[in-house]
Amino acid sequence: NLGKQWAVGHFM
């Protein structure tokens, strides 16, 4: 999921 990938990139 794109949303998850973006979130992971921002939070990690």
Curated annotation (Swiss-Prot):
Could you tell me the keywords of this UniProt record? Answer: Amidation, Amphibian defense peptide, Secreted
Tissue localization of expression is: Expressed by the skin glands.
| Keyword Secreted among UniProt keywords | yes
Protein name from the UniProt record = [Asn3,Lys6,Phe13]3-14-bombesin
Mainly resides where? secreted
Q: Where is this gene product found?
A: Secreted
Q: Which organism is it from?
A: Pelophylax ridibundus
GO BP field: defense response; neuropeptide signaling pathway
Chain positions with Methionine amide modification: 12
Q: Which family does it belong to?
A: Belongs to the bombesin/neuromedin-B/ranatensin family.
Give the lineage: Eukaryota, Metazoa, Chordata, Craniata, Vertebrata
Q: Quote the cellular component terms of the Gene Ontology held in the record.
A: extracellular region
Keyword presence, Secreted? yes
One Pfam family, please name it: Bombesin
